[in-house]
Amino acid sequence: MTDDMHKTENFPPDWLLVESLDLEAQGVAHRADGKVVFIKGALPFELVSANVHRKKNNWEQGVVTAIHRESSQRVQPGCPHFGLHEGACGGCKMQHLHVGAQVAVKQRVLEDNLWHLGKVKADTILRPIEGPAWGYRYRARLSVRYVRKKGELLIGFHERKSGYVADMKECPVLPPHVSDLLLPLRALISAMEAMETCPQIELACGDSVTALVLRHMEPLTHGDLALLRGFAAQHAGVQWWLQPNGPETAHLLDEGGQALSYDLPEFGIHMPFKPTDFTQVNPHINRVLVSRALRLLDAKRHERVIDWFCGLGNFTLPIATQAREVLGVEGSEALVARSRQNFKLNQALAPVNKSLAATNFVARNLFEMTPELLIQDGAADKWLVDPPREGAVSLVQALAELHQQKLDPIGHPPIVGAVGWMPPKRIVYVSCNPSTLARDADLLVHQAGYRCSFAGVVNMFPHTAHVESMAVFDLEV
């Protein structure tokens, strides 16, 4: 904000006019001398006072102490554990902002990142994908800690900017049946001999089963195992998993029972998974996300599609209902094996007149891709790319190198197999980090011969500052 804009507002010099929110959901303001001030708890267009607790040459950071002019988008938080008070939960950052305004903030973050970091502007902004604002979080990692000074055990997320566990009795972003388990879980773990050696419970909800993965540092006694079994018997749909070491050691307490799974009914896909597998936190949004991604991909029955970072096949299997041939590429051999199992299961379940396309899966280190490896996986008409937060820079860099070699074969070393290899005419990129999306978009648009046709946000995590998004890149003819 310029000095002139400050002068148009007649307010005391120590008051701050908030202009926007940053990626941590802090209000961003400027002092009259241009210094940036980040203010926790402040919203855009509010006039506030702040207690500054950190100062640098070019910026300051503080906490709002008074709101002199309130935003029309400020709302009452839906959770008693949210806020700036001591002991407040750090799981959510934006409950004080109307959910529609949260989406607008995330859309601005996406567009700002694309332009300022990648010098890319989408031809068309997609309508945001939105869903339920509460009860959406079907995956969570809850910390468990016995506090000797208080003589009590706590289960919940960490406190805001702290390693301490918040004293949570409920959590409205969890499904109600899971939120209702928080206090019973406290009582359960408090009664166990292993109370002080169980640091974490990871939860994963399927369509009909809730898996609780108990991380335990020491072997559990017969008495503790009996308590876990009794808890599961009292709470319908609860399934205990035990994890003595890393995620790969997680196993069912008792074999049998219903498998953890979710469905993508639009495509007739059934997806079994383990609680330690990566699946989307928000199943409601995931269904809409897959549907939109496939509409944008627009795979035809004569086309070959590659799904990079395919995981368990969340996109791969729906694509197989539309394309001629699909290749799923993933970094983990174990995940590739599981993807193959999921494909075989769905192939067996599919009606004769709706059989899945020929689908293969390969393991590949997607953070060390080369043009030669890209060629080895074969040309495809279209790509779907769904990377982790680190993005897909190695993949798109390899694509850019092939494009540059084609444009200037004399100025670039020859690439074995490049002759006859064709780049995908469309790429649908699903991102969980707008800054790495912008970096990869820069490569695709300015070095690989694509334009950004569409971009938009996906509100996968309401009330948090996490920005999920989707962009479509089309090859320039």
UniProtKB/Swiss-Prot annotation:
InterPro entries linked to this entry: 23S_rRNA_MeTrfase_RlmD, MeTrfase_TrmA_CS, NA-bd_OB-fold, SAM-dependent_MTases_sf, U5_MeTrfase_fam
Span of domain TRAM: 7-66
Keyword line: 4Fe-4S, Iron, Iron-sulfur, Metal-binding, Methyltransferase, rRNA processing, S-adenosyl-L-methionine, Transferase
PROSITE patterns in the record: SAM_MT_RNA_M5U (PS51687), TRMA_2 (PS01231)
Enzyme Commission number(s) from the entry: 2.1.1.190
Gene: rlmD
Protein name from the UniProt record: 23S rRNA (uracil(1939)-C(5))-methyltransferase RlmD
Recorded family membership: Belongs to the class I-like SAM-binding methyltransferase superfamily. RNA M5U methyltransferase family. RlmD subfamily.
Transport as UniProt keyword: no
Residues noted as binding S-adenosyl-L-methionine in the record, renumbered to the chain: 280, 309, 314, 330, 365, 386
Active site annotation, chain numbering: 432 (nucleophile)
Broad enzyme group: transferase
Catalytic activity: uridine(1939) in 23S rRNA + S-adenosyl-L-methionine = 5-methyluridine(1939) in 23S rRNA + S-adenosyl-L-homocysteine + H(+)
Any one of the GO BP annotations: rRNA base methylation
Highest taxon in the source lineage: Bacteria
HAMAP family to which the protein is assigned, alphabetical: 23SrRNA_methyltr_RlmD
Amino-acid positions noted as binding [4Fe-4S] cluster in the UniProt annotation, renumbered to this chain: 79, 89, 92, 171
Short name of one Pfam family: tRNA_U5-meth_tr
